[in-house]
């Protein structure tokens, strides 16, 4: 009897000292709980591109965790070989070790170009092999079945539903309670969520992935227009989110934004950091209000993977999205010192550098520094737009009555509004209110 009690006591002690998260990770996670855990993350090419595969190292996951990245969407386009699994295993382990949720997302290009039975079998086989390999992994790992339904497949909603039915059936053979994600056609557009048919074997562990502005906002394309953040431009974003909320209410299935981008990095890079911040803050705030998690596209725009460091100039954009770097903040945000000499004010950073010919965010306000590094005041013409800096150097927004007695309007990004109507007041080509 004493031996039995001793054995039970040892067993109790053994389990009591194990980390709680090791148990939690091996318990199936319901979709709504999973959505809350996802929080805010990044799309990554760690297992997709040659450069991404070669550059990846464990420090990356540590840095992501320190920045407050809660999940990563690991995009994959190739067949899974032993080497592919070896690298992906490492990435997933690194994520879990650093409290980052990993999501495997498959490109399935051939199937999107030609949704034939032959190509469907290839994708079903790919997911079957991948699901078998990860069947005993933490339930924090999830599967995003197809990245962006584009090309020919986007024209065939019924075929897409058949495809999801077959893939889900295959994955459920080995992963009955793992979170799976399906996305609507036409580049995961939430307008087509209602076209989705819920797969038979969803088993109550299903989410929908959708996105907008995945490749960028635009200053000319009306479908994803963002210039200065007009009411009309904001409404485009709100309407998309409401489509997702309506679908969630109708189906009881949570959604997640798998990709959105703060700037047009791949198409001219026409948005300044300051403009990106204004856009990023509005999008992230609206998604936060809706309790919809999101992933930002993509890591290489913010993180130097060759040198394992965040780009200092992009940290304000990350912060606008709600990411917070732990322990050591950017020199932009901490350990800065205002210095005044016989010419004017300038900003000394922790590394003794100082901003020149650029905007800098300090204590929640934007400042412009000239080519000598001195803080600007008054009207300044920057990148083909007029801005007004208050006497303390902070950027002005809203209505401004200038010394000439005329009224001007400064947009949310600080730029002067021209040739437009604001609140019923017409503004001319020089920005002044036309009386």
Where are these regions (language model features)?
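Sec-dependent N-terminal signal peptides of Gram-positive bacterial secreted proteins and lipoproteins
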Residues: 2-24
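Extracellular adhesion/carbohydrate-binding repeat motifs centered on closely spaced tryptophans
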Residues: 14, 24, 332-435
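N-terminal carbohydrate-binding accessory modules
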Residues: 22-71
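Acidic/histidine-rich helix-loop elements
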Residues: 40-58, 76, 80, 115-118, ...
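Aromatic-lined substrate-binding rim segments of carbohydrate-active enzymes
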Residues: 57-111, 120-125, 129, 133, ...
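Surface-exposed, active-site-proximal loop segments in enzymatic domains
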Residues: 78-87, 108-122, 151-153, 221-227, ...
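Active-site region of glycoside hydrolase catalytic domains
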Residues: 124, 128-225, 231, 239-263, ...
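Aromatic-rich peripheral "rim/lid" segments of glycoside hydrolase catalytic domains that contact
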Residues: 268-335
């Amino acid at each position: 009897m004493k031996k039995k009690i001793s054995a039970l006591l040892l067993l109790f002690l053994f389990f009591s000292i194990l980390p709680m998260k090791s148990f939690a990770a091996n318990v199936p996670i319901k979709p709504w709980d999973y959505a809350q855990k996802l929080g805010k993350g990044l799309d990554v090419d760690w297992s997709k591109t040659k450069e991404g595969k070669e550059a990846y190292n464990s420090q990356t996951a540590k840095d992501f965790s320190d920045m407050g990245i809660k999940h990563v969407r690991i995009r994959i386009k190739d067949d899974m070989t032993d080497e592919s699994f070896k690298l992906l295993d490492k990435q997933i382990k690194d994520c879990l070790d650093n409290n980052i949720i990993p999501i495997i997302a498959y490109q399935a290009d051939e199937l999107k170009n030609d949704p034939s039975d032959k190509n469907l079998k290839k994708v079903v086989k790919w997911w079957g092999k991948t699901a078998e390999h990860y069947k005993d992994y933490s339930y924090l790992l999830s599967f995003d079945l197809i990245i962006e339904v584009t090309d020919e497949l986007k024209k065939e909603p019924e075929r897409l539903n058949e495809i999801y039915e077959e893939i889900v059936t295959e994955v459920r053979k080995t992963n009955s309670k793992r979170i799976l994600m399906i996305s609507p056609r036409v580049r995961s557009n939430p307008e087509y969520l209602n076209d989705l048919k819920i797969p038979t074997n969803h088993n109550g562990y299903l989410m929908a992935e959708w996105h907008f502005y995945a490749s960028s906002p635009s200053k000319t394309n009306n479908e994803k227009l963002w210039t200065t953040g007009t009411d009309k431009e904001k409404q485009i974003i709100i309407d998309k989110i409401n489509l997702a909320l309506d679908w969630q209410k109708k189906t009881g299935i949570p959604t997640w934004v798998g990709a959105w981008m703060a700037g047009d990095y791949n198409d001219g890079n026409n948005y300044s950091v300051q403009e990106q911040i204004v856009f990023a803050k509005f999008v992230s705030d609206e998604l936060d209000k809706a309790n919809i998690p999101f992933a930002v596209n993509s890591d290489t725009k913010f993180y130097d993977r060759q040198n394992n460091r965040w780009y200092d100039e992009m940290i304000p954009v990350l912060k606008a999205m709600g990411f917070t770097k732990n322990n050591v903040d950017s020199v932009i945000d901490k350990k800065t010192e205002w210095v005044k000499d016989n010419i004017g004010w300038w900003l000394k950073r922790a590394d003794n550098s100082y901003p020149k010919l650029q905007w800098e965010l300090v204590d929640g306000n934007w400042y412009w520094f000239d080519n000598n590094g001195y803080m600007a005041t008054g009207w300044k013409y920057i990148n083909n737009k007029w801005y007004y800096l208050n006497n303390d150097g902070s950027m002005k927004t809203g209505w401004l009555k200038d010394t000439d007695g005329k009224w001007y309007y400064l947009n949310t990004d600080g730029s002067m509004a021209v040739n437009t109507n604001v609140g019923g007041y017409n503004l001319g080509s020089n920005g002044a209110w036309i009386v």
